[in-house]
Amino acid sequence: MALRNVPFRSEVLGWDPDSLADYFKKLNYKDCEKAVKKYHIDGARFLNLTENDIQKFPKLRVPILSKLSQEINKNEERRSIFTRKPQVPRFPEETESHEEDNGGWSSFEEDDYESPNDDQDGEDDGDYESPNEEEEAPVEDDADYEPPPSNDEEALQNSILPAKPFPNSNSMYIDRPPSGKTPQQPPVPPQRPMAALPPPPAGRNHSPLPPPQTNHEEPSRSRNHKTAKLPAPSIDRSTKPPLDRSLAPFDREPFTLGKKPPFSDKPSIPAGRSLGEHLPKIQKPPLPPTTERHERSSPLPGKKPPVPKHGWGPDRRENDEDDVHQRPLPQPALLPMSSNTFPSRSTKPSPMNPLPSSHMPGAFSESNSSFPQSASLPPYFSQGPSNRPPIRAEGRNFPLPLPNKPRPPSPAEEENSLNEEWYVSYITRPEAEAALRKINQDGTFLVRDSSKKTTTNPYVLMVLYKDKVYNIQIRYQKESQVYLLGTGLRGKEDFLSVSDIIDYFRKMPLLLIDGKNRGSRYQCTLTHAAGYP
C-alpha cells in the first residue's frame, strides 16, 4: 500500500473503534469492520496487535492488516523527521514549505528527501563556517593547539608563543603549551635505564651523584641487560667492570647456598629410613610383646605403619596373596586387632583370639582354620549357613505372584469355580433374557456359555438396564492367561478369572454400548444375579 493512502500514526492512536471501522469501510474491508465493532478495537490497540487480537480478524485479512499496521508505524517515523525542522528555522521559505507539507499528502512525498538536505546545507553554512575559518587561521600560522575561539587576538597570542619551542625541542607532547620545561622531561624516562647503570656502583664505591640514587630498585632489573647497554655511557663504565665481576660471585653464592640445603636434607631422609629399617630387626625375636609395643608407638609417627608391614613380609613370603589382603586391613586404625591375630600362632595369647575372630571373621580364615584355639570362628560360620536358609526362603517368596497367573489355567477348570448364583452353563439366549426379565430390575445380570463356545470366546455377560438386554463377550487370552471384557477396543482391564470380573463391576460401573445406537452411553453396576437358585 502506498504511503499516501496510509494515515499518520499519531492520528490512528487517537481513533476510537467507530473511526477505525469507518477507515476499514473506506478500504472496503467489511469483515474487518465487523470485527472492530464487535471487539471494540481502537486505533492504539490496532497498532499494537497481539496474537489474540489477530485471531479475532478473518484469517485472509491477517497478512494485510499486519502489513497495514507496520506501514502506519513507519509513516509516523518518517513524519518525525519533519516535525523537528521548525525548531531551527533558518529561512522563512522553509517554514512555509513545511506548512504545506503538513497540509497535503503529495507534498510530503516530494519533500521527503529534498528539504532535510537543504536544511543541512543551510545549517552547515550558518553553524560551521565561522569555527572552521577560525581554526584555519592558526593552523596556517603554526599548526598548534589553541584555546576555544572566544577572542581571535588572544587565541593567536596563546597559540604563537608556546608553538615556537615545540619544533626545536622535538617533543612528543603538543597538548602542554604553557610550560616549556615539561616537554624536556618526557624524554628523560627512556634515558633513566641508561643512567641507572652508573648509580649503583657509584653508591657502593663513590659517594657522589645523589640524585640518581633514587633509582636503587631499578639496577636489579637492569643487571640482566648490562651487556646490551654498555656502549652508551663511556665515562662511568670504567668503574663498572670490576664491580660486575665482583657482583657475579655474590649472585652465584646464594645459588650454591640454595643447593646446599637440599643436599643436607637428602641424607636426613635415608637416615630416617635406616632407623625405621633397624627397628623391625630389633623387634623380630620377641614376636608378641614387640608387635604390641610397636603398635602403641606407631600412631605417633606417620611413616611407621608401613614399617611393621616389612616385618610381616619375611614371615609370610610364601603366601603373597594373603599379604595383599592383610596389608590394607591394619591401616584404618584396626592395628591392635590385626596384631593379635599373628601371635595366635603361639599358645600363650589364647584368650585374645576370640576378639579378633568376632570382629574380623573373613580376613584370616587360613590362620583360624589351621589352629584349634580359634574355635569361636567355626560356630560363627556354622551360624552363617543356618541364617542363610531363611534368606533363600525370602528369595523364594518373591516369585510367589507367579503362581497367581496360572489361577485360570483353562476355561474348563474355570467352569468348576464359577458361582451358580450368576452362572448358567447350558442355556439359550431367549431363556437367559427371560430369566433376567423375571427380576426386571436395572443391574440384573448373569453369565452364560457363548453360542460359539471357543477357547477365545467362552462366556457372555448379559445385563438388563432400562428394559434392554446387553450382551457383552468375555474373551480369554492364552498367551497372558487373562480374561477380557468386551471386544478389547475400548476396555483395557484384564482379569485373572470370570469371578474377578463380576466382583469388580459390582463395585465399579460398567459401560453399556448399544450396537444399534452408538450414541447412547449408559453405566450401571451389577446388582442382581439372575442365575438358578
From Swiss-Prot:
Compositionally biased spans, kind Polar residues: 337-350, 365-376
Annotated localization: Cytoplasm
Ranges for domain SAM: 15-81
GO biological process: cell surface receptor protein tyrosine kinase signaling pathway; immune response; intracellular signal transduction; mast cell activation; positive regulation of protein kinase activity; T cell receptor signaling pathway
Recorded GO CC terms: cell-cell junction; cytosol; plasma membrane raft; TCR signalosome
Pfam families: SAM_2, SH2
Post-translational modification: Phosphorylated after T-cell receptor activation by ZAP70, ITK and TXK, which leads to the up-regulation of Th1 preferred cytokine IL-2. SYK-dependent phosphorylation is required for recruitment of PI3K signaling components.
Tissue specificity statement from the Swiss-Prot or TrEMBL entry: Highly expressed in spleen, thymus and peripheral blood leukocytes. Highly expressed also in T-cell and monocytic cell lines, expressed at lower level in B-cell lines. Not detected in fibroblast or neuroblastoma cell lines.
Pro residues bias (residue ranges): 184-213, 400-411
Swiss-Prot/TrEMBL keywords: Cytoplasm, Phosphoprotein, SH2 domain
Sequence ranges assigned to domain SH2 in this UniProt record: 422-530
InterPro entries given in the database record: Immunoreceptor_sig_adapters, SAM, SAM/pointed_sf, SH2, SH2_dom_sf
List of residues that carry Phosphotyrosine: 23
Region entry Disordered, spans: 78-417
Sites bearing Phosphoserine, chain numbering: 207, 376, 410
Composition skew (Acidic residues), residue ranges: 108-155
Function recorded in the entry: Adapter protein primarily involved in signaling pathways within T-cells, as well as other immune cells such as platelets, mast cells, and natural killer (NK) cells. Plays a crucial role for transducing signal from the T-cell receptor (TCR) after antigen recognition leading to T-cell activation. Mechanistically, once phosphorylated by the kinase ZAP70, mediates interactions with the guanine-nucleotide exchange factor VAV1, the adapter protein NCK and the kinase ITK.
Quaternary structure and interacting proteins, as annotated: Interacts with SLA. Interacts with CBLB. Interacts with GRB2. Interacts with SHB. Interacts with PRAM1. Interacts (via SH2 domain) with CD6 (via tyrosine phosphorylated C-terminus). Interacts with FYB1 and the phosphorylated form of FYB2. Interacts with 14-3-3 adapter/YWHAZ; this phosphorylation leads to YWHAZ proteolytic degradation. Interacts with VAV1; this interaction plays a role in TCR-mediated cytokine production. Interacts with AGER; this interaction plays an important role in AGER-mediated pro-inflammatory responses and cytokine release.
Pathological association: Immunodeficiency 81: An autosomal recessive disorder characterized by recurrent infections, including fungal infections, associated with T cell, neutrophil, and NK cell dysfunction. B cells may also show maturation abnormalities. Other features include autoimmune hemolytic anemia and abnormal platelet aggregation.
Domain notes: The SH2 domain mediates interaction with phosphorylated CD6. The SH2 domain mediates interaction with SHB.
Record-given protein name: Lymphocyte cytosolic protein 2
Annotated organism of origin: Homo sapiens
Phylogenetic lineage: Eukaryota, Metazoa, Chordata, Craniata, Vertebrata
Gene: LCP2
